[in-house]
């Protein structure tokens, strides 16, 4: 089991947005991975993007450029 660390977790309204995020990140070489939404977060769909906190600015720019709507950005232990 992985050691829990403080991460940036991007929650989405829809699964389609989560999948679009994964595709955009892979195309742009942005780190991160899809995870089940942590229990501490309530989100519209069951998937979230997990990435290091240091990537917040890059993630926000990618969301804007790709036209992906995030429900919220959270900092939580994952």
Where do the model's predicted regions map?
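Short glycine-/aliphatic-rich beta-strand segments at the starts of folded cytosolic domains
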Residues: 4-11
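Short amphipathic alpha-helix segments
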Residues: 13-31
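A short linear hydrophobic-aromatic micro-motif
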Residues: 31-37, 71-72
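Short, flexible, solvent-exposed loop/turn segments with mixed acidic/basic and small polar residues
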Residues: 1-2, 35-40
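C-terminal structural segments of small proteins and small subunits
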Residues: 50-78
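A short acidic, helix-capping loop that chelates divalent metal ions and anchors anionic groups
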Residues: 41-45
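A generic "binding-loop/recognition-motif" signal
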Residues: 15, 37, 55
């Amino acid at each position: 089991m992985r050691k829990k660390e403080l991460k940036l977790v991007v929650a989405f309204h829809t699964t389609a947005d989560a999948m679009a995020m994964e595709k955009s990140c892979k195309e742009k070489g942005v780190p991160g991975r899809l995870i089940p939404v942590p229990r501490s977060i309530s989100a519209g769909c069951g998937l979230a993007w997990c990435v290091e906190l240091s990537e917040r600015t890059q993630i926000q720019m990618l969301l804007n450029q790709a036209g992906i709507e995030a429900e919220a950005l959270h900092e939580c232990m994952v």
